[in-house]
Each structure stands twice: as C-alpha cells, then as structure tokens.
Amino acid sequence: MYTRVFDRTEEETCSVDAVVPDALGDLSALVVTEGTFCLWNLAFSDKSAQIEGCIAADVVYAEENGALRSFPVELPVKVHMSGETLAEDVRPWLRCTLAALDARAVNSRKVRVTARLSLCLRAYRETELALTERIESEGGAVFTHTEPLCVHVPVAVEEQTFTATQMHRFSDGQPETERLLCHAETVLLDEVHIADGRAVVQGRVRTSVSYLQQGQSCPVSETFETPFSQLLDCPADAEPCLVQASVSLTAAYLNVSTAADGATLEAEYHLVAQTVCFGELTAECVTDAYCNTAQLQLEWETIPAGTVQQAEPLHLAAEGMIACDAAALTVCAQRAELCGAASDGCDVLVRLLVTDAEQHVSCLEKRLHLQFETGGTRGELLYALPEAPAVTATADGFQLRAAVTVDEAQFCPSEFRQVTGVTVQERVCPYAAVPSLTIVRWNGEDLWQLSKRYCSSERCIRETNGLLDDDVPVELPQYLLIPKTEV
C-alpha cells in the first residue's frame, strides 16, 4: 500500500515580454491570447520537487488597418516545492490547470504576456499499515479486545506516457496561408474506472482553433477532438475499487495541409497519465486491553483511516452577464473552459469572440464559479466536463449560462485508535475482590466490558455460556455465568 506524504496546491505566475516579429505590422489593439501548458519534467530530490514546463501561447492582435495577425510566445515554467517528506523514492500525482492567460500592449511593437498556473502536487510513498495484533506484558496475562478495521487506502500509484494522433478535416473553410491564428488544447476525462484489476482512463484532447479564410477579415473558429484510451496496471495485493487519474499534455504538434478536396489538421499529442488506485483493506487490530494481575497504562495510536466511494455525477450550472451593447455585436465564436478546480467547486471561463458593424474583432470574457454540494463529507474531484455555453443577447448585454458535469469521490474519514503497547503501573491484582464465579443479568451489554469488570475473558464467557461464533443460539440467555480467569 501507499500513504500520501505530500499534498500541496500552489499558483505560479510567470510573464514574458514578446516583440512583434519584423514581418508583421504594428500592433493597434489586442484581440485575444490563447495558450496551453505542457509538462516537460517532474522530478523529486531530497526534500524538494521540481516541475518544468512551458506555456505555448498565440497573441492575436489587430493592425491599424484592422487586419488580424498573430505570433507565438513561449512562457517557461519552473516551479520548486519544498517538503520534509519528499525524497527520490516517492511517486507523483500532478494536476495542472491554466487559470489565467492575458496580454497587454507595452507599445506598438511589444506585448507583455502573463499567465497564472495552478499546480496540485501529491506524493505517495510505499509503506505498510502497522496494526497491533497482540499485546504482551511481563506483568501477567494480558487480555485484548480486537475490532475489524475496514479502510480504503492507495494500493497502486502508476504513471504512463502515450501518444494520441488524428487527422481532422476543416468543415467551415480553408485557413489562409496554411496557418492558424491561434489554438488552445484542453485534456478532458470522460471516464475513469477499474476493469479486471487495471485502471481504464478514457478521454479526449479538445483543440479550439481560430483561422482566417482567404479574403476574409472575420476569424473562423472550429473545435476538434482527439480521443484516447489507456490501460494502466495496478500491481497490488488488494483488489482496486476506485481510481483517481490525471492526464497532462507534454507536447502538441499541429500541422495544416491543403488539398484539392479541402484542408486538414494533423494533430499529434504526447501525454502522461498518472493514477492512484484505492483498494479495500480489512484487518483485526487491538483496540483495548487489560491484565488480571496488574494495572496497565495503555499506549495509543490514531490511524488515519477512512473509506472512499464514487458519488453520483453532479450536473451544475452557473449564470452570469457580460455588460455590453449586445445588439451592436455579432458572436462569431464561443466556448467554455475549466480554469480552476478544487474539492468544493470549480471555475469556468466563458470566452466570446465578437465583431461589430465595422467587422472589428474583440474578445469578451466572464469567469463563473460553480459550487459543489458534498453533504458535509469531504469530496475529491475526479474530473469535470464543461459543456458549450449558452449565450443570449439582452438589452443589458450577453446573458451566459455554463454547465459542467462533475464526477466526485466522497471520503468518509474515521479516527481509528489502536493499542500499540502497555506499561505496568503496579504489580498487585486490581480484581482481588472479584468472586471466582459470578452470575449477572444480561441486557445485551458488550461482553468485553463484562470481561474487564469481572476479570474474565471474552472468549471464556462465550465458551461458558454457549455463545461461540459458530454456534450462536437463536434466543440469547437472560443471565450469564462469568468465571474469573486464573492467572
């Protein structure tokens, strides 16, 4: 099994000043900045973790004459996290979310691109669940009470790299000069489950592209989806029952090609999948003890235990308003993307590309928050699927409605205390006044409590009164014969 030794969510902000290429005209107005984060490396060393990657962005702007142009910008990402529990032998689980990407003009030839990245990093170390099965003492016979422990623990933490490729055909036209104005990729998980002891991760890479057609000033936007399906082994002693997965993009290659029958987009994506599989562990452990010849001081340990189960999918929606003169604008593209996720909610960014009467293109954005209702239990986001936004023009602006399907796991923690050792307080029998044979009226009281009270043992009481586990009478006796256990 594994135990989580590190869990931290940090936000990293990075920026870069980019110069408009010499082949392009001066910048008059910024339109939109699209981009994607690619994870290049994740490594652990003693008490630290290093995350390296890059945000590949496209800055779309308008020249003085209104013509749209774009150029690529790269924002390097280097994040260092420190933690006393980190070491080279831990295994990672990382979720990256591009929370914000923006650009502003410094002058007509320079822009400053700023990005905010949310990183949720967890580390797991292989370990054993130390349970107390018996207690021994030099002070005499120690009687123990055991209870069954049933918990869900990480039993496998795996990582796998893979590639997804597909050829897409442009349906709305042909890109001018065989290049895109901008593009952005999002990895969506459709289903994550356990089948035949292995983790099944199914999803798609959604690519949103914008391009100009020959002789047109208004951009065309299309969305292409490249599916993927991966099987990850779960080498573990316990049968896995639930899996939490994260899939990160490590590289994206897009190529536009034209032919007599139309234009196509060749998409090749390199990805890494990380999974944490939970399995059910059952064991008997000591929860109480006493000695018939001495007073004992018990040593306790709290086990961070709990169970986990997948909840029913949540269908959430949030509404908002972009204040503007909607009657004077035409929406030419709209989409919603996840820009933040936590255990209690997620953020969705709704982005509209609009044109006015003079065919000037601009971008309108609105961030909407959706709250999860977990019913008091601790929820863990498995994945979230944003749907296409609904946009309605009103007298006050554009009314937005964003819907998201959220799959969650519910964690029910339980503080389980076990006895790990005993210390003899005094070597005199604390039960000297207890008679050697006692008859008590039984009202269903716990046998372990009776055994401690009358210096007996639970097993002895069961044997004396015919209450063996394999031969329980239909009618329980009203009285119990409790013999005092000899040392």
Question: How would you describe each model-predicted region?
Answer:
Residues 1-433:
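Membrane-lipid interaction segments
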Residues 426-463, 468-487:
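Primarily a LysM-type cell-wall glycan-binding module
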